[in-house]
Amino acid sequence: MIPRTTDAGLILRKAVEKDIPLILNFIKALAEYEHMSDKVLASEETIRKTLFGETPYAEVILAELEKKAVGFALFFHNYSTFVSKPGLYLEDIFVYPDYRGKGIGKLMMKYLAKLAIEKDCGRFEWSCLTWNQPSLEFYKSLGAKTMDDWVTLRVDGKNLLKLAESF
């Protein structure tokens, strides 16, 4: 379905292997925005292996304006047992600050919604930090709702290893 060009010259396209440095830059910029730069473990090597290797675990779309990458979205498919359909999960979306308010994020979200429909997904979902009010308002303007009855849980690092070794 993509690439797609808008009247304003914005192009959405699927990322390819040569875009790995761009993807890593977006990940680092997002981490800085979210005050989590110290948490980034991604490298060009890990991105190559996990996004463009033998088993790609996720996909990336890039938004380009005047041949410059200004936004990205990384997503993958999950599955809902209740609706018995795949879902589309948006792991990250980020638009560089100088390009916000121009409809770039909205166009990426519309594209992902259309992709979810084309793939017969039962839902399109993502997480957002509670302090990130600008993003929460943006998502609500698209028709998204917060899932107040749900809490995100995670096991990682040493606890993940400990849990696995206890099997």
List the predicted regions and their residue ranges.
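A short beta-loop-alpha structural element at the N-terminal edge
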Residues: I11-I23
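Conserved GNAT-fold acetyl-CoA-binding loop/helix
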Residues: L24-T50
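A short helix-loop-beta-strand connector motif used in the catalytic cores of GNAT acetyltransferases and
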Residues: L51-L62
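Conserved beta-strand in the GNAT
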Residues: L62, K68-H77
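Conserved acetyl-CoA-binding loop-helix of GNAT-fold acetyltransferases
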Residues: V95, G101-K114, S141
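Conserved active-site alpha-helix within GNAT-family acetyltransferase domains
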Residues: K106, E118, T130-D149
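Conserved GNAT acetyl-CoA-binding A-motif
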Residues: I117-S127
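Conserved beta-strand-loop-alpha-helix junction that forms the acyl-donor binding cleft
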Residues: W126-S135, R154-G157
